[in-house]
């Protein structure tokens, strides 16, 4: 990302004849919030004095009696919006206390910034790079409801295998076949891949917004699962990239009559959508993860970083897999990484070491468990803090496992730890194991307590008290 100053932003706004500035910040669960001001009101005072807003209406922020908050712009995030009818400049802001002007401790972007500063303070490294690969589904329609006397959801995509018997295509013409089999969507060309033109539009919008792309393709799942990969970035910017990526993917689909979801598991019986996170540490422009004598070319630093990720995974997943739906994905049989080990070839391991040859700059690890249902600022920061704890305390991971973990004999499989099976478990683990997150004041106890309460009250308990439709298939005639 090119460094920008306030003057650069003003010049961009003038050159592009910007009419409006969209003020953006992130709530605690991970949804970007915004309001719009006219370009004429966007001047130096915004950078000096900020913009006030009511924080009591933002999830996870202030209570009503202390609602006033302040926003200060981050000039490096200025981008022209590709979707607005009027020429609009989008800018991400940091949240501050309006009286002390201190960064707000529950602002996710501020937490990511603190994580980067803490990394530097340790002397271990000065830059953490993250490359996140977020999968998603493209549907034609979605409907759902949850009432006292009924509950349902239904998604549809004309390319879904369940539509082999449909009379017509989406345009009303006769069914012409070429539906994608469950778990059969990885790489077939058109007409099996019916989304190539839409993905091309997504690619174009991403490129025009500054992304350096690697590839886009249909993913394994039927019904339009897809993935588009782009270049890594430093932690805070990588989280900004993920939020912008999701905004562009969703709105490109919306403008073309489709709807996108990043839910980890929207379909029963097919692959879920993950957010594999490639990570590496650098210092003074030099990579720290490579040692030609180590397993898979890993340095001691890299191995201990992995040790920290795996050791803290049961609590770390509270930020990297933070929804009830996350644990519908982390089950055997769907290429999901549920085994808390590392490997240079096994994709069912939580940590995989990509084959990068002898290039030290390319050496990295891939944490495969995360999904994109949460807050990338918190997720990336939490992963870094777990890895740094591993380095500081020289946490050794369990020996690498290069066998097919699903084919191990029972006695050997029993020695392989696995990810927790439900959100309530990882929230309990976070309550017991979070000191690694509060090192250097990166995460505060208040933030962690707020996260735990929010998840229990707004997600875990509401799901637990509602009858599930499948329970009627099991128990109605008891």
UniProtKB/Swiss-Prot annotation:
What keywords is this UniProt entry annotated with? ATP-binding, Cytoplasm, Ligase, Magnesium, Metal-binding, Nucleotide-binding, Phosphoprotein, Virulence
O-AMP-tyrosine PTM positions read 406
Instruction: Tell me which residues make up the GS beta-grasp domain.
Output: 16-100
| Pfam families, alphabetized | Gln-synt_C (PF00120), Gln-synt_N (PF03951)
Q: Known EC number(s)? A: 6.3.1.2
Highest taxon, organism lineage: Bacteria
How does its activity get regulated?
When cellular nitrogen levels are high, the C-terminal adenylyl transferase (AT) of GlnE inhibits GlnA by covalent transfer of an adenylyl group from ATP to Tyr-406. Conversely, when nitrogen levels are low, the N-terminal adenylyl removase (AR) of GlnE activates GlnA by removing the adenylyl group by phosphorolysis. The fully adenylated enzyme complex is inactive. Also inhibited by the diketopurine analog 1-[(3,4-dichlorophenyl)methyl]-3,7-dimethyl-8-morpholin-4-yl-purine-2,6-dione, EDTA, and by L-methionine-SR-sulfoximine (MSO).
Q: How does it assemble?
A: Oligomer of 12 subunits arranged in the form of two hexagons.
Q: Which family does it belong to?
A: Belongs to the glutamine synthetase family.
The protein depicted here goes by the name: Glutamine synthetase
